[in-house]
């Protein structure tokens, strides 16, 4: 095990990558054997699965961000149409729209950006198992020196087991067009390497194609109509899978296995996450319908109206006035028999001057 850590290099990437791969290798080597081809192949594949499991939550955010971006496409097109000539104003309005909806485009790129250093780290670690070729950033060692030198977390014994691991003469660390460093492998057969590598390479290209196709099929019509999105869809469907097939002969067999397993994981995880999000959205719609149904009145029932109550002061005033008027009228009625004999007093009494409730007072003639 190499314990020399260089703080001014990318060792902070190389050591974690080699450690995760070493843990899985020790587990599968215990079952299959230390020099078994599939023990090393599974260690590379489970390195991918470990990374993708750690990036599960950012991947879910990426999917949600992508769907949110598709939902905002009509508003984005409206802003582009309105402020197409004013780039600065359009950028400000776009930022405002993103803030209003809590949209962060960086979250959509996080899983992809996180995989780049891991891919570079794995490529460097696999390349460091065979230092007999030299090259950029690598010492030029002899075959014996190479087997006596550790590779980050891997011990010199592990390095020897990696160089000995092959499938029908196809070493896992070799590539089809390799010309130098062949002496480091115990058994190397180029026809066997091509026979093993080409099917894996084609499977990796097919997995890339179906992964891109599944992702494009879930795009909205507005997003697919965007010229930039349409161009990226064509690249993802045809150029990227073809790039895997064309570039495969120049990459170690372990890297092709890495690419194949990464696309298989992405395909399954994408299907699961999209299904989960669709179920959540369907549950929200059903909950909204249930709430509207609970708040709606029963069929044929009249809506209940709260009774209107008059102010107490307005209700009390007529009552009091009525009481006083009734009292005055009763007093006048008791006095009327005594005044019947004198018409002058009957006309000049208080009962003649006070009008009854609701009767307009008579105007006096001047």
From Swiss-Prot:
Membrane topology: Multi-pass membrane protein
InterPro entries attached to this UniProt entry: YidC/ALB3/OXA1/COX18 (IPR001708), YidC/Oxa/ALB_C (IPR028055), YidC_ALB_C (IPR047196)
Stretches for region Disordered: 285-366
Biased composition regions of type Polar residues, renumbered to the chain: 339-351
Function: Required for the insertion and/or proper folding and/or complex formation of integral membrane proteins into the membrane. Involved in integration of membrane proteins that insert both dependently and independently of the Sec translocase complex, as well as at least some lipoproteins. Aids folding of multispanning membrane proteins.
Biological process annotations from GO: protein insertion into membrane; protein transport
GO cellular component, one term: plasma membrane
GO terms for MF: membrane insertase activity
Primary location: membrane
Source organism (scientific name): Mycobacterium bovis (strain ATCC BAA-935 / AF2122/97)
Transmembrane segments: 3-23, 28-48, 106-126, 191-211, 237-257
Keyword terms: Cell membrane, Chaperone, Membrane, Protein transport, Transmembrane, Transmembrane helix, Transport
Compositional bias of kind Low complexity: 308-321
UniProt-recorded name of the protein: Membrane protein insertase YidC
Lineage: Bacteria, Bacillati, Actinomycetota, Actinomycetes, Mycobacteriales
Localization annotation: Cell membrane
CDD domains noted in UniProt: 5TM_YidC_Alb3
Subunit structure: Interacts with the Sec translocase complex via SecD. Specifically interacts with transmembrane segments of nascent integral membrane proteins during membrane integration.
Family in the record: Belongs to the OXA1/ALB3/YidC family. Type 1 subfamily.
């Amino acid at each position: 095990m190499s314990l020399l850590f260089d703080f001014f290099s990318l060792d902070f990437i190389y050591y974690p990558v080699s450690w995760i791969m070493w843990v899985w290798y020790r587990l599968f080597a215990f079952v299959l054997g230390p020099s078994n081809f599939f023990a090393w192949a599974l260690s590379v594949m489970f390195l991918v699965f470990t990374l993708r499991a750690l990036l599960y939550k950012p991947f879910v955010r990426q999917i949600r961000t992508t769907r949110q971006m598709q939902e905002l496409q009509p508003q984005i097109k409206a802003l582009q149409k309105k402020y197409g000539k004013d780039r600065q104003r359009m950028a400000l309005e776009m930022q405002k729209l993103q803030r209003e909806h809590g949209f962060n485009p960086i979250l959509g790129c996080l899983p992809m950006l996180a995989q780049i250093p891991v891919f570079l780290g794995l490529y460097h670690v696999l390349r460091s198992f065979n230092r007999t070729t030299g090259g950029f950033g690598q010492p030029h060692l002899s075959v014996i020196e190479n087997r006596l030198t550790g590779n980050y977390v891997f011990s010199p014994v592990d390095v020897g087991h990696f160089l000995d691991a092959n499938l029908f003469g196809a070493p896992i660390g070799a590539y089809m067009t390799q010309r130098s460093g062949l002496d480091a492998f115990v058994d190397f057969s180029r026809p066997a390497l091509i026979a093993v590598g080409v099917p894996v390479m084609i499977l990796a290209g097919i997995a890339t194609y179906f992964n891109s196709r599944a992702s494009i099929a879930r795009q909205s019509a507005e997003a697919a109509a965007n010229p930039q999105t349409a161009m990226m869809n064509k690249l993802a469907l045809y150029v990227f899978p073809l790039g895997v097939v064309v570039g495969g002969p120049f990459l170690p067999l372990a890297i092709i296995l890495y690419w194949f397993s990464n696309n298989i994981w992405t395909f399954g995880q994408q299907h699961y996450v999209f299904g989960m999000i669709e179920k959540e959205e369907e549950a929200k719609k059903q909950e909204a319908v249930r709430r509207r149904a609970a708040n709606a009145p029963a069929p044929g029932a009249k809506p209940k109206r709260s009774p209107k109550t008059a102010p107490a002061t307005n209700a009390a005033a007529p009552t009091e006035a009525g009481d006083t008027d009734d009292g005055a009228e009763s007093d006048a009625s008791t006095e009327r028999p005594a005044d019947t004999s004198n018409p002058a007093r009957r006309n000049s009494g208080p009962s003649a001057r006070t009008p009854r409730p609701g009767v307009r007072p008579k105007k006096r003639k001047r």
